[in-house]
């Protein structure tokens, strides 16, 4: 009953108004799975390739008709008649047929959309929720947890048009007793932050991920206004709510230095920027820092891990690009202590699950993440619960492309009850 009988690819629109790939996988018995590939703004150089058409007469060259053509043509032909429950087998067929190291023939956007749609169709054929099926694929059936959210409430860097260098300033409601309560706490801080910014005469327009993008005088000022909002919402900073940052440092790495516009265009060495971050962690309860240096600055990361690695969570995103080969090298060298998981960086569900497992086996944490270009597809919510990853990063408390994931988590928590605990601070490395 889980044999693939039809595969359909189409071009749809993401949250930035750019095209992306959506796939449908149809099985015998009428079961259907549908999924869409997300898209990033600040991308690691070693990510699997997102195939764009380059035809300037359509969508400024960002069309995905080539990738859609791959779904409707060679991919569909290769997987027809195959068992959708054999996720690893389906993914291997597509990867082998593509034949490139970085999926540049069909595009990771094509392969991923079919990979996720296959998982959804297989879950439907088994009468399961997607998170249940993912837990089985992961070799951890029935083992679930609700993730602690990292809520990106102030956007800077590539995600906003302002003078803040650090790309994301996030809150983590570690003191919540449930995911539902964590969402409420996040929402209340988000709305209080709007009041704080308005009172200072600042802009409350939102960036790509639904957070505010005010023109602040410095990076530290972003932390200060969030601290004010947490207090105004009636919560205690450091106890109820902790802070996290995504530096996306590759975006301001120039000629071997970290050049920060928000700090008067000061140029920092790797060591100096590490101590700049360390100073911020002493002033504010920052428990997680992502991409604190450039993706190629491995010596710098070794130093940063030595200085901060036993105190806080250091997350590799552009550094590892959800790639087990690169992650293994990082683990062997003791670089950072956590990985950000974005399944479009690697391009299939099977490879994503392998990266999560490798990280956990090495004592690293795994943070499941959206991209800045998203759709209503909420698969990452099921991925976070089904792998018991422990943390999720899916934007702020606005924009339906972000909220879709929180709402799916609320539904899953309701369905699972005590089978999926919300573990709060314990999920964060170093806490």
From Swiss-Prot:
EC numbers, comma separated: 4.2.1.11
Cofactor(s) the protein needs: Mg(2+)
Binding site for (2R)-2-phosphoglycerate: 167, 342, 371-372, 393
Cell compartments where the protein resides: Cytoplasm; Secreted; Cell surface
Residues binding Mg(2+): 246, 290, 317
Superkingdom as given in the UniProt entry: Bacteria
Protein name stated in the entry: Enolase
Organism: Enterobacter sp. (strain 638)
Gene name as annotated: eno
């Amino acid at each position: 009953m889980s044999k693939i009988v039809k595969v359909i690819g189409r071009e749809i629109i993401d949250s930035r108004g750019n095209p992306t790939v959506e796939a449908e996988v149809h099985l015998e018995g009428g079961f259907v799975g549908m999924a869409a590939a997300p898209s990033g703004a600040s991308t690691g150089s070693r990510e699997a390739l997102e195939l764009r058409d380059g035809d300037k007469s359509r969508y400024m060259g960002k069309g995905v008709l080539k990738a859609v053509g791959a779904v409707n043509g060679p991919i569909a032909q290769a997987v027809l008649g195959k068992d959708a429950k054999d996720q690893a087998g389906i993914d291997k067929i597509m990867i082998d047929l593509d034949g490139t190291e970085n999926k540049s023939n069909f595009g990771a956007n094509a392969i991923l959309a079919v990979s996720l749609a296959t998982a959804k169709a297989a879950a439907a054929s088994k009468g399961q929720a997607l998170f249940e099926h993912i837990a089985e694929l992961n070799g951890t059936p029935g083992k679930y947890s609700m993730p602690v959210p990292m809520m990106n409430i102030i956007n800077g860097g590539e995600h906003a048009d302002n003078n803040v260098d650090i790309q994301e300033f996030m809150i983590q409601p570690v003191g919540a007793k449930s995911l539902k309560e964590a969402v409420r706490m996040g929402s209340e801080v988000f709305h209080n932050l709007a009041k704080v910014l308005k009172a200072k005469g600042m802009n409350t327009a939102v960036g790509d991920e639904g957070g505010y993008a005010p023109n602040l005088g410095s990076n530290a000022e972003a932390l200060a206004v969030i601290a004010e909002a947490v207090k105004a919402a009636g919560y205690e900073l450091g106890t109820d709510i902790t802070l996290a940052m995504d530096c996306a440092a590759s975006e301001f790495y120039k000629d071997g230095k970290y050049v920060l516009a928000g700090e008067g265009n000061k140029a920092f060495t790797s060591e100096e920027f590490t101590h700049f971050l360390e100073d911020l962690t002493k002033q504010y309860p920052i428990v997680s820092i992502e991409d604190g240096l450039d993706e190629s600055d491995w010596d710098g990361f070794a130093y940063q891990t030595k200085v901060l690695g036993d105190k806080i969570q250091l997350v590799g995103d552009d550094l590892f690009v959800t790639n087990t080969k690169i992650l293994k090298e990082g683990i062997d060298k003791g670089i950072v202590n956590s990985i950000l998981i974005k399944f479009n960086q690697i391009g299939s569900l099977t490879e994503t699950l392998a990266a999560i497992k490798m990280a956990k086996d090495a004592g690293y944490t795994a943070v499941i993440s959206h991209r800045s270009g998203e759709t209503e597809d909420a698969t990452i919510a099921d991925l976070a619960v089904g792998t018991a990853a422990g943390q999720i990063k899916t934007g702020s408390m606005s924009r339906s492309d972000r909220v879709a994931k929180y709402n799916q988590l609320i539904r899953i928590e309701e369905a699972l009850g005590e089978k999926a605990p919300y573990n709060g601070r314990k999920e964060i490395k170093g806490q």
